[in-house]
Amino acid sequence: VLKDNGYHTIHCGKAHFGANDTPGADPLKMGFDVNIAGHAAGSPASYYGMQNFGNKPGGKSPLAAVPGLEKYHGKDVFLSEALTIEAEKALDNARTTDKPFFLYMAHYAIHTPIQPDMRFYQKYLDKGLPPIEAAYATLIEGMDKSLGDLMDYLDKNNLTDNTVLLFMSDNGGLAAHTRAGELHTQNYPLNSGKGSAYEGGVREPMIVSWPGVVAAETKCDHYLMIEDFFPTILEIAGVEHYNTVQKRDGINFLPLLTGKGKMPARDIYWHYP
């Protein structure tokens, strides 16, 4: 819908929109002008450029092998860093189109395999974390650095004041045998984690930056669901008339951002098949 309304649309990172060999496996068939490393898989075969991100040149690569980053194969670069570099290049190209841009930056981190980002690993070991938790922490910090790098890019190119930034996660943190500690404490003070209907599984972070509209250091405790982003982003972009094949379940939460108006009340539930 954004592409049809004049936006240059960029996907970077994890797609996982549809199964392999279906149209949904390819972000270019889902409305994006640019696809960087997105395909059917929801996790990478490897986060390491030295391991070709799981690709096996000359052999059959696993489904989770990350596509499209061949320039980094055999190099000492972590996936989160490579994606950030490519996202900035895509933004450079977007600025030459004289169109507004939409960047969907979806890191493969923080997802299994829990592999350490060596840029940050040693300091977490020095803090006394067990190796698996130290590795988990590096995935978080790598994503945090990526966000900071992209925000620096916006500042450097005088785009910050005219850019809306929405940061969120699709589920709670991992709570599984692949992590250290008891399952019910891994997202403390919330119970359980990803795949659970407890708060550790369904309560996610969200941060919004919109200079001149969203007041800094304000908080909102109203609950949202991921479907709410679709109508809200279109409202922010000024798209008023559009049709979709699917039923639209989301509610525009722009009133919460502007402080003008309220969200309608609704019941919420989670189904985990």
Please name every model-derived segment.
Residues 1-273:
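Formylglycine-dependent sulfatase
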